Amino acid sequence: MRRNIKLIVFVSIIWMFVMVYYFQSSTEKVENRALRLREVATAMQQYQDDSSSAAAASTARQWAPAGGGAGPGAAAGAAGSGADDPGGNVILIGSVKDFERNAVHGLKLNGIVALEETSQGLSGGTGGPGGRLPVAPSGRGTEVEYFNEAGYIRAGALRNGEDPYIRNRFNQEASDALPSNRDIPDTRNPMCRTKKYREDLPETSVIITFHNEARSTLLRTIVSVLNRSPEHLIREIVLVDDYSDHPEDGLELAKIDKVRVIRNDKREGLVRSRVKGADAAVSSVLTFLDSHVECNEMWLEPLLERVREDPTRVVCPVIDVISMDNFQYIGASADLRGGFDWNLIFKWEYLSPSERAMRHNDPTTAIRTPMIAGGLFVIDKAYFNKLGKYDMKMDVWGGENLEISFRVWQCGGSLEIIPCSRVGHVFRKRHPYTFPGGSGNVFARNTRRAAEVWMDDYKQHYYNAVPLAKNIPFGNIDDRLALKEKLHCKPFKWYLENVYPDLQAPDPQEVGQFRQDSTECLDTMGHLIDGTVGIFPCHNTGGNQEWAFTKRGEIKHDDLCLTLVTFARGSQVVLKACDDSENQRWIMREGGLVRHYKINVCLDSRDQSQQGVSAQHCNSALGTQRWSFGKYA
C-alpha cells in the first residue's frame, strides 16, 4: 500500500512537470503572423460589411466552391477541393471589380490562384481593405493557414557537398538554418524607444527587387517587414523578380498576405526593375529595400514621419550589418553619413567632431547626408515621379545611388539618415551574378552618365581619378539633361558648397602625355605598383600613356606617382602609391628636361630596354632626356 502511494505521488509529480512544460511552451510560442495566408471568415465578413446587400448576395453566389460549376471556382478548375488543393481554399490576389466581372485570369500555385490587381479595381473603392478580396470561403470556418516555410526553403536548398558560398557569395547554409522570424537585437539608441510618432502616417508600398536571391534570405526580408511594421502602414509588398532562373522563387511568395509578384520577361537590372515596381505600386509613399535585409523594431514609423512632414525628403535607415558568414546581426554606428571620393565610389564617413557634439544631447535627430547607399530608402511617390524616377538607361547595378543623390539635392530635395530607423543588410565582398560586358564596364558606364549630367566641369576630377572611364561609351543623355533644365536644378558647384563642403576639389593638374622625339611616349608598360616605366610608340588614346602633372610636381598615372628610388645618379624610377614625399616631386625645365626638384638628375630613356626610364645627370644635349608634355595629338 505504501509503495502504491509513493508510485502515485511520483507519477503525479511527473505529470505536473509535463503540464507546466507544455503550458509554458504553448503560451510562449510567438505566432509568425507574416506567414499567414488569407483568413477565411474575417476577409469575407470585411467584404460583406462594406458592400450593399444586393452586391453581397451577388458576391456570395460568385464565391461558390471551386468546381461548383460557376464563377471563379469554375475558372480555376478543380482547385476547390481536389488533390491539387488539400486545404480546400482558393486564395485570390486581385481586384474586386475584376472578380465581380468574372475576369479571373490567374496563375494556379499549389491550389492558389494569384491575380494581379488592376488600377480600375483599386480605385473603385469597393471590396475589402485596399479593394482586395483576400480569401475565398470554404468549409473550414475561421482557421488560419500559414505559408509552408520549410517546404519553400527546402526547394531551394544546397545540394549535398555544394559550396554554401557559391550561389550568393554569402553562407546560404547559415541563412537556411535560421527561422524567418528570428530574434535580432534592438540596436537603436535608448532614446528612440521612448519617441512617439504622429498617428496620421501614410501607408507605404514596399518594393523589393531580386535576381536569384537565396529563398531563406528573401523570405526573411519579407517576414521582417510584415512582423516589425504596424499592419495598417504596409499596403503591399511588391516583389519584382528580375528574371530569376526559377520563377517559383517569387511566385510561391504570392501566397503570403499583402505580397504581389511581378516577373520580368528578361533581365532588366536594378534600376528598370525598381521603376516597374514603383509604377505598379498603389500607395502614395514608396519604400525601396534590397532582398537580403532584416528590418528592426519600429523601423518604419520614423521614416514615414519625415516624409509626411516634407514630401521632398528622401530618408534612409541606419544600415546595420548582417554577417555574410554566420548571419550575426551587428549594430552599426549612428554617427555615419554617406559620401564619396573623386573616383565616385560610395563610402561611409564619420560625422565631424563638431557635428557629433551637436548631436550629443539628442542622438535621435536626422542626419543630412550628401549621398545614400541606394539600397534602402523611402520617398514620396509623386516626388519620385516628378524627379524623373531613375535613369532608365543605366544597366544592371551601380551608380544609380550617385545619380539619384545628386538629383535630389540639386533639384530642391534633401537626403537624410534617420538614426531611430534600423535595417540590417547582408554585405558581400563580391557580386553573385554576372554583368553583361563585365561589372567594371557597367559601373563605369553608369557612373559616367551621372557625372556627365550632374557634375558640370567638375566631372574632369572624376576622369583624372579614373582615366580609363573615358574609354567606356555612356550612351545618349539628352533626356536627362532636359530633365535637369526642366526642374531648374542647381549646379554642382552649389552642391559642393552647400551639401558636401568636405569634398575638396583636387589641386589643378594638367592631363596629357610625355613625348620624346615626337613618336615615343612615356608608358607604364602595363606595370603597376613598384613597376618600372619605359617608352613606347605614341597611340594618342591615353591608357598606359596618360599622365597627370600636378601643381605639386607629381607625375601621376591613376593613383600611382613616378618615384625616385634613391637620391643618386642612375637611380631607377618606379611607380609607387602617391604619398606626397620628396621622391615624387619633379620640375619641367627649359629644353624639355624633367628634373627632380631636389637633386640634379633628370628622366632619361637611354637604358630603358634594360631597366626602364632612369634618373641620370641632367644634360639638355641628350635626346634621351628631352620631353614635351601636352594633350594628345
Curated annotation (Swiss-Prot):
InterPro entries assigned to the protein according to its UniProt record, in alphabetical order = GalNAc-T, Glyco_trans_2-like, Nucleotide-diphossugar_trans, Ricin_B-like_lectins, Ricin_B_lectin
The UniProt annotation puts the region (Catalytic subdomain B) at 366-428
Biased composition of type Low complexity is found at 54-65
User: Is Metal-binding there in the keyword field?
Assistant: yes
Region listing for Catalytic subdomain A, in residue ranges: 201-306
Q: Which residues lie on this side of the membrane: Lumenal?
A: 26-633
Designated name of the protein: Polypeptide N-acetylgalactosaminyltransferase 2
Tell me the organism: Drosophila melanogaster (Fruit fly)
- What is the organism lineage in this UniProt record? Eukaryota, Metazoa, Ecdysozoa, Arthropoda, Hexapoda
